[in-house]
């Protein structure tokens, strides 16, 4: 009985943590954030390393990054308009999102990969101390 109670308690805690994480993810405007680490850069800036995983066509709110972002494809396919034209990226490739480039939301002519396509990406971005690495545009 002790083992069942402990397992049940762990399951409830896991569900609550998952729900809290999902709620934060919804507030932040990104889909699929599964981990995020922040590293101090000489006390003046922070380096964010974030892993995302999602299936289907990504829907992110319109936003920009005050400091540029590097996105690395761990697995799957994604597309970016960062070069000025839609480009498709797959496992092992990467792209750079320039500082202050507004993107996300309903992008015209966005490449579609379908509901069965899953992807994992690693986003690496910096920000000045006290500033958010991502700013959402209303």
Label the model's feature ranges.
Residues 67-84:
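Glycine- and acidic-residue-biased ligand/ion/polar-headgroup-sensing regions
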Residues 57-69:
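A short beta-loop-beta micro-motif enriched in histidine and acidic residues
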Residues 6, 15-51, 114, 132-138:
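A short, N-terminal "cap"/entry segment at the start of jelly-roll beta-barrel domains
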Residues 42-43, 64, 72, 87-88, ...:
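Extracellular/periplasmic catalytic domains that process cell-envelope and extracellular macromolecules
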Residues 1-4:
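Positively charged n-region of N-terminal signal peptides that target proteins for export
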Residues 100-132:
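Ligand-binding loop in jelly-roll beta-barrel domains
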């Amino acid at each position: 009985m002790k083992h069942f109670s402990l397992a049940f308690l762990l399951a409830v805690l896991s569900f609550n943590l998952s729900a809290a994480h999902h709620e934060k993810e919804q507030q932040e405007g990104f889909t699929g954030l599964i981990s995020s680490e922040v590293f101090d850069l000489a006390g003046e800036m922070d380096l964010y390393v974030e892993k995302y995983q999602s299936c289907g066509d990504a829907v992110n709110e319109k936003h920009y990054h005050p400091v540029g972002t590097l996105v690395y494809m761990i697995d799957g396919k994604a597309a970016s308009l960062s070069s000025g034209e839609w480009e498709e990226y797959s496992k092992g490739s990467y792209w750079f999102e320039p500082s202050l480039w507004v993107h996300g939301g309903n992008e015209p002519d966005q490449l579609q990969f379908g509901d069965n396509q899953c992807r994992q990406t690693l986003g690496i971005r910096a920000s000045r101390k006290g500033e958010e690495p991502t700013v959402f545009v209303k």
